[in-house]
């Protein structure tokens, strides 16, 4: 059952943004950065084709979400190479081919640029955009959805709609960086910081779900740094 394409072995990758930064000190959203990033992706796909011919097993390139690994890998890079700006200065690695979470870019440009890399990630991929509450601007949200339909294999919208069980506040919870560098969630209305009393929904590992104490500090840093694309 493993042979002739009935099963797939995934070659997962992450940190395409950091790799391009390390090599040419540019984001892969620039012309030169994009060209290098596509060369890297094509090389990964070429290896998958080579292994497929050699083994008769189906190999494919997979855009890895890298949830727990994002913190572990970032710390390992800091340990082995010291801190390099825009490469390992943060406690997380950018997922797969994604535009870095800190980069200011509009939704349509982000989705368009990432669509090229989705085509080279046949083992699985997902793009996302960060959006504010769109309840009062549904037409704009529909335009984004239409664009995704026409340009992307798989993409989703992340919004922020949290609830404080202590005071009943309904909106976006704050993420506060403490003196020791760790992050905690806080209700902007009453100051509640007990995560068990805050219903916070964010995308982690490709799915929208309630944030709990199980989310590592690296991923929390990623969430903290995410910018809106609309």
Label for each model-derived stretch:
Residues 1-230:
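Long, C-terminal-biased catalytic regions of enzyme "large/alpha" subunits
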């Amino acid at each position: 059952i493993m042979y002739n394409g009935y099963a797939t072995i995934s070659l997962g990758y992450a940190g395409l943004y950091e790799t391009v930064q390390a090599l040419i000190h540019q984001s892969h959203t620039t012309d030169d950065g994009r060209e290098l990033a596509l060369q890297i992706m094509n090389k990964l796909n070429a290896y998958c084709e080579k292994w497929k011919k050699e083994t008769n097993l189906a190999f494919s390139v997979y855009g890895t979400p890298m949830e727990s690994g994002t913190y572990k890998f970032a710390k390992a890079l800091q340990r082995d190479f010291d801190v390099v700006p825009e490469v390992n200065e943060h406690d997380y690695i950018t997922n797969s081919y994604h535009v870095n979470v800190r980069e200011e870019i509009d939704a349509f440009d982000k989705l368009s640029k990432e669509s090229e890399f989705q085509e080279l990630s046949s083992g699985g991929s997902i793009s996302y955009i960060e959006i504010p509450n769109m309840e009062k601007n549904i037409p704009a949200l529909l335009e984004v959805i239409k664009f995704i339909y026409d340009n992307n294999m798989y993409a989703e919208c992340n919004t922020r709609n949290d609830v404080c069980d202590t005071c009943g506040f309904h909106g976006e919870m704050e993420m506060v960086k403490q003196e020791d560098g760790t992050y905690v969630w806080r209700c902007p209305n009453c100051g509640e910081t007990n995560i068990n009393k805050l219903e916070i929904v964010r995308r982690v590992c490709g799915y929208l779900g309630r944030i709990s104490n199980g989310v590592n500090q690296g991923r929390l840093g990623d969430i903290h740094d995410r910018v809106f694309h609309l």
